[in-house]
Curated annotation (Swiss-Prot):
InterPro entries found in the cross-reference section: D_Ser_am_lyase, Ser/Thr_Dehydratase, Ser/Thr_deHydtase_PyrdxlP-BS, TrpB-like_PALP, TrpB-like_PALP_sf
One GO BP: isoleucine biosynthetic process
Cofactor(s) in the UniProt record: pyridoxal 5'-phosphate
Family: Belongs to the serine/threonine dehydratase family. DsdA subfamily.
Keywords: Lyase, Pyridoxal phosphate
Lineage of producing organism: Bacteria, Pseudomonadati, Pseudomonadota, Gammaproteobacteria, Moraxellales
UniProt catalytic activity: D-serine = pyruvate + NH4(+)
Recorded GO MF terms: D-serine ammonia-lyase activity; hydro-lyase activity; pyridoxal phosphate binding
Entry-annotated residues carrying N6-(pyridoxal phosphate)lysine: 118
Gene coding for it: dsdA
EC nos: 4.3.1.18
Pfam families tied to this protein: PALP
Descriptive protein name: Probable D-serine dehydratase
Matches recorded under CDD domains: D-Ser-dehyd
Enzyme class label: lyase
């Protein structure tokens, strides 16, 4: 972006200067529409989400058979929702501000199969593609027991096809693991931010890992180009895929079921706040769509991004979406939160969800390290830095009077609020890597 254009943009959007200075900030969205109007702009419906849930149910017998870790939930890929009262108390002490309401952790960090939120969207899209191919070939019917897919004849059939994806790590991991299990040939195009252990894990499964010295955007673009050369190759597009998005959206319906089981009330007097780490936007965007369908006006969805990679905040704030990158305003897009190291947000998610997402904030890397150490110390739960991005959300909400006034959130309502921190990854991090994360804040 030319300097002149940037100067004009900064006059119109003064918050850009704060982003350029790598400062932490909270911006709440003044452009939210009434719920039904905003949902209509997404281009997808509740019926689409229910069909995604039904597809996952069809695959459950197969998943339970080939991934023993899913057997306890009969092949359902779902994570626990746990109360973290000690963490809440520790955060209150750290910020010298009593955080009211109840704090919960949604442990997508420990989802079965691939240990991150990407197990929702990534695995779902691979399954949807496999189902389509097998049905078109006359090998599978919707009413079949899908555990039959665990046969050499199906693996041989799928081996004629290739799946490709560009990733900073976790999406590649989920798609690589699932595709290889079904028998597909897989190529994962990985950016410079991707952790070595994730590449090693994929290679051990026979996945072709293509490494780039550049960032996420280049890995996606090169993956897309390579896939276009092969008519038998299906490219999973993290930036634009509605299938991925629907896989994530199922989480909203599932969380509502968990709330019912735990008798957690959500209504006008008992608001729900959900804090979601955001990279390119597909995961948090899809989950938020599902949450808005499930809880309506009573759920507040807040996105969290590293100060070095605030691509969704920048795109939605300026209205430029994927037409602007963090590099255009001079940011380096280098962060310890490798899963969030994305310079240009998904245009599809930004435009679809801009009237639904309630707020956005940025967080320093050092703060991420402190938060994962605090969670480990108070709750004995280990997550990766990306997963901690949402943990400052309750503090921002409760210390921003304009936001509270806009949504008519009284002290009494906040007293009865539920706060859910969506932990997005970390369950598969090797112990020695996790130890480095946890000791980082002590050594600085």
């Amino acid at each position: 972006m030319k300097t002149v254009q940037l100067d004009q943009l900064k006059q119109q959007f003064p918050l850009i200067q704060t982003l350029q200075d790598y400062q932490e900030t909270f911006w709440f969205n003044p452009h939210r529409y009434p719920l039904n109007e905003a949902l209509a702009k997404v281009g997808l419906t509740e019926q689409d989400v229910k069909e995604a849930e039904a597809r996952l149910a069809r695959f459950a017998p197969y998943l339970a058979k080939v991934f023993p870790e899913t057997q306890a939930q009969y092949g359902k890929i779902e994570s626990a929702l746990v109360k973290i009262a000690d963490m809440q108390q520790a955060l209150s002490l750290q910020k010298h501000k009593t955080l009211t309401g109840k704090l919960w952790l949604k442990k997508d960090s420990h989802l079965p199969i691939s240990g991150s939120i990407k197990a929702r969207g990534g695995i779902y899209e691979v399954l949807a593609h496999a189902e389509k191919l097998a049905i078109e070939a006359g090998l599978l019917k919707l009413e079949d027991d899908y555990s039959k897919l665990d046969q050499d004849s199906f693996r041989t059939f799928f081996s004629k096809y290739q799946i490709a994806v560009g990733s900073t790590g976790n999406l590649g991991l989920s798609i690589g693991i699932m595709s290889a299990k079904l028998g597909f040939r897989v190529s994962v195009h990985m950016s410079a931010d991707a952790r070595q252990w994730k590449k090693d894990k994929l290679r051990s499964l026979g996945v072709n890992v293509v490494e780039y010295a550049s960032d996420y955007g280049v890995a996606v673009e090169e993956g897309r180009k390579a896939a276009e050369q092969d008519p038998f190759c299906f490219f999973i597009d993290d930036e634009n895929s509605t299938t991925l998005f629907l896989g994530y959206a199922v989480a909203g319906l599932r969380l509502k079921q968990q709330f019912e089981q735990k008798q957690i009330k959500v209504d006008a007097d008992h608001p729900l706040f959900v804090y979601l780490p955001c990279g390119v936007g597909g995961g948090p965007g899809g989950v938020s769509f599902g949450l808005k369908l499930a809880f309506g006006e009573h759920v507040h969805c807040i996105f969290a991004e590293p100060t070095h990679s605030p691509c969704m905040l920048l795109g939605v704030y300026t209205g430029l979406h994927d037409q602007i990158s963090v590099n255009d305003i001079g940011l380096d897009n280098i962060t310890a939160a490798d899963g969030l190291a994305v310079g240009r947000a998904s245009g599809f998610v930004g435009r679809a969800m801009q009237q639904l997402i309630d707020g956005y904030y940025t967080i320093h890397d050092e703060c991420l390290y402190e938060l994962i150490a605090l969670l480990n110390q108070t709750e004995n739960i280990q997550v990766e830095p990306s997963a901690a991005a949402g943990m400052m959300g309750p503090y921002y909400v409760q210390t921003t009077p304009d936001y509270l006034a806009l949504h008519q959130l009284s002290a009494e309502k906040l007293q009865h609020a539920t706060h859910v921190l969506w932990a997005t990854g970390g369950g598969m991090v090797p112990p020695d890597e996790m130890q480095k994360y946890l000791t980082h804040s002590q050594s600085n």
